[in-house]
From Swiss-Prot:
It is a multi-pass membrane protein. This is Protein NRT1/ PTR FAMILY 5.10. It comes from Arabidopsis thaliana. Expressed in shoots, roots and stems. Detected in leaves, flowers and siliques. InterPro entries: MFS_trans_sf, NRT1/PTR, POT_fam, PTR2_symporter_CS.
Amino acid sequence: MSISGAVDEAGTPLLAVTVDYRNKPAVKSSSGGWRSAGFIIGVEVAERFAYYGISSNLITYLTGPLGQSTAAAAANVNAWSGTASLLPLLGAFVADSFLGRFRTILAASALYIVGLGVLTLSAMIPSDCKVSNLLSSCSPRFQVITFFSALYLVALAQGGHKPCVQAFGADQFDEKEPEECKAKSSFFNWWYFGMCFGTLTTLWVLNYIQDNLSWALGFGIPCIAMVVALVVLLLGTCTYRFSIRREDQSPFVRIGNVYVAAVKNWSVSALDVAAAEERLGLVSCSSSQQFSFLNKALVAKNGSCSIDELEEAKSVLRLAPIWLTCLVYAVVFAQSPTFFTKQGATMERSITPGYKISPATLQSFISLSIVIFIPIYDRVLIPIARSFTHKPGGITMLQRIGTGIFLSFLAMVVAALVEMKRLKTAADYGLVDSPDATVPMSVWWLVPQYVLFGITDVFAMVGLQEFFYDQVPNELRSVGLALYLSIFGIGNFLSSFMISIIEKATSQSGQASWFANNLNQAHLDYFYWLLACLSFIGLASYLYVAKSYVSKRLDTS
């Protein structure tokens, strides 16, 4: 962030709280901005190529070479995805408290390469088993242990990589400079654009290799991609801005002290609190009066906290209602790599007489719609909205997220209607008892729900990224992005829990469950209608919470 009047010998403005790779004050003209962000977005493209090379087709590997049932495989995918989305909390803690973002990215990249290498070796172990109805695999025990150990090592590596790379990229822009502040908002759009470009390449190339050539090769290529990501990251070292961490207390300790002090001072009178507020110069506003019970931490009786520390603690606490009301959106988001993929496997997938599209490749329509829509959103819709609202982002971050949640509700309605059509077609052609038969219904029927998912992500996903980066204290921005990712971690676990409960409840008395291995006897349409109802309730809850949200005070010093 810039300091007025701070210049080098050539008259180039310097930046405070940031240094260059030589540990000297960063010079604005030769560091940061898009020159640095380009390298970091390149790293994200390669990393997402590697990650989705594993996750996008994971359910096919589990139900194929490892021989798990559909319900068991979906539960395992959700459990792993949930873990991968929660581990960024650990990675962000390590980065913001100890290593810093850049060093954490380096360590996570090395761990990533090791995990993907072991995963490749596990796929080379021969396996010959039929589909199991148990939650365990029928593959050789050593293969299963090696595979899942490597899989969760990849999740751990992703936990250190994901929040730090994005926060490190956003750190390259000075939010107090109007032009760089505007560029930072665009950075989140183009970051997601790059991420989806990497995902799109994975879905068209790697999924075909995994389904038709070799799983070992399909897992080995992501390992090579992570080596490339590490090289690209190092190439940009000379251009990066590195944030300087304060040498006093950890931000976690400072925030924790506020909560502890407020509890210790719980019995102090309102007059004492008012006196402390006046003594410290706390301005009465909506921000200061929200969570006013924390203002008791300002009373010197049992340990006083500063106003800045109080605001840090409040800014974290304000995120909780938004976080909670977005969980249903995360449950909906978890369905595309699981049941959507299994649906596609039952449908007519021929493009040419000799080529069938991989079911997992259908997920590419999510990325494709994002790649197409983000430039339209960033270059057309936002300037139009900006001319009316005079806001740098055109619309607020909360409005953007709410629009995405509404679109996720529409996506589940469309998914339910399409599945009803697929089941009717299977019944009309007498294929209800033929799980291996191809339902004479084009797989392109699934495209609208995938496209809606993509447009939903442009609004909700990118909005959540920017919101959780922007609304936390500066020193906790890796944690802010980890909190955003944890929404999807908990969402995946909730999805897995729902699947397990519904599987047990609907398979009693020998009846086919909603998630039967034979999808022509299953009722995924019921599950999608349930998610649509939950999405509507989640949207209503979100709108109620967002209406009363108080934004973080901007430090103008």
